[in-house]
Amino acid sequence: MNTAPSPSDRPLSHALSHTPVLAAEVVAALAPAPGRVIVDGTLGGAGHTRLLLEAGASVIGIDQDPYALNRAREAQLPQLTVLEGNYRDMRELLAGIGVTQVDGVLLDIGVSSFQLDDAARGFSYHTDAPLDMRMAQSGESAAEVVNGYPEEELAAIIYEYGEERHSRRIARAIVQARTQAPIQSTVQLAEIIKRAYPGFSKGIHPARRTFQALRIHVNDELGALRDGLRAAEALLTPGGRLAVIAFHSLEDRIVKRFLRASPTLKSLTKRPVEASEEERGRNPRARSAKLRAAEKVAAPEGLPEVEV
């Protein structure tokens, strides 16, 4: 099993540097104020958390990445409680500190900016690094997936999670390449995909969708999102707010369907909120961000759980 770089091997910064997407829109959706407790289920670089704290709210930040946890703890932000774990388990994590209801939940889905910027994590096809892609420091790595899974299973993952129409061609190329030598680095995999991709010249790198698919699979991101939405719905007090930022159609579709089917969440966004042209120009990662928000309302007891 590949070992992800240890967070203890990297210098820690006293200042968190994450630039949050849709910052003003998230604050407006969650309505932070003194006395309100908000869960940031995807703490990351704590960019959104800082804004919520500045508005007077108390924040419980959850992350499974030890590096993110170390950065947040080192910053010693007042009114911030940091918990290690996956946001899909937020009910159990909060119960462990005696919290059963909160006033808001934020989920900023997918890989964080500083995970993308850290070449050693293996999320990017632009820089050479071990093929890892794990947000936590445990579990199956992307290298184990591409070197061990059957061709049909690889094709299914790439098609379903990457929405890649050339999934079979790419899976075949991966299997052929690994018979010659194990695929161990990001650039190695990206080159295999590029050679297999028909008609590629310039533009969006052909490895983008496959890397997305592998990352989603390795971290069970869509399963975590489904579980996290149910957990958030259960934790929110009446009048509490939920805000979810998705970065691709698979995530946004799950959020949309969940909010539409939930008997206890009233949507506050008829359509997903997107970044302004100014923000897109300033922060390219905001280009695909879509924010949906909802408010918890009272509902009769005994209603069935929403399936998404």
Curated annotation (Swiss-Prot):
Positions of the UniProt region annotated as Disordered: 269-308
Cite the SUPFAM superfamilies for this sequence. Putative methyltransferase TM0872, insert domain, S-adenosyl-L-methionine-dependent methyltransferases
This protein's source sits in the domain of life called Bacteria
- The enzyme class is transferase
Residue pairs linked by disulfide bridges in the UniProt entry:
none
**Family designation:** Belongs to the methyltransferase superfamily. RsmH family.
The protein, known as: Ribosomal RNA small subunit methyltransferase H
